[in-house]
């Protein structure tokens, strides 16, 4: 018996919608990353993008435990000398609530072209509305 290897053109991708309200950030992000990779499917192949499309709503209502709201800091650098910027979780969730979940999921995906292709299938919205009704997404309880 030969080992099954999925081909990119034969992979069937579904659309799912996830409500992030009250969910813990890391637990939610790890499940979303796993689904974006396609690890929940029997035909999972590491070098093929077999994951589904994930729409996340209510990203502004995601929860963190402990004092992480005040203590968790996100860093970025402008590549200029002295260009290190930082922002706390509290400020980032107020300014760009989608970015918190996007950064958490992106850090759990592989680096390189395949990881970027997986990341493009993630759609995050701060509120309860999304504009992917035409794709008829199924509700996914995580």
From Swiss-Prot:
Query: What transmembrane ranges does the database entry give?
Result: none
Q: Which GO terms describe its biological process?
A: negative regulation of translation; translation
Q: Which UniProt keywords apply?
A: Ribonucleoprotein, Ribosomal protein
GO MF terms here are:
mRNA binding; structural constituent of ribosome
Q: Which SUPFAM superfamilies match?
A: Ribosomal protein L13
Q: Does the keyword Acyltransferase apply?
A: no
**Where is it found, in Gene Ontology cellular component terms?**
cytosolic large ribosomal subunit
Which Pfam families does this chain map to?
Ribosomal_L13
Task: Report whether Ribonucleoprotein shows up as a keyword of the record.
Answer: yes
Q: Which Gene3D superfamilies match?
A: Ribosomal protein L13
Subunit-structure text:
Part of the 50S ribosomal subunit.
The record's listing under NCBIfam families reads:
rplM_bact
Per the similarity annotation, which family is this?
A: Belongs to the universal ribosomal protein uL13 family.
Could you tell me what this protein does?
A: This protein is one of the early assembly proteins of the 50S ribosomal subunit, although it is not seen to bind rRNA by itself. It is important during the early stages of 50S assembly.
Q: What is this protein called?
A: Large ribosomal subunit protein uL13
Q: State the species of origin.
A: Vibrio parahaemolyticus serotype O3:K6 (strain RIMD 2210633)
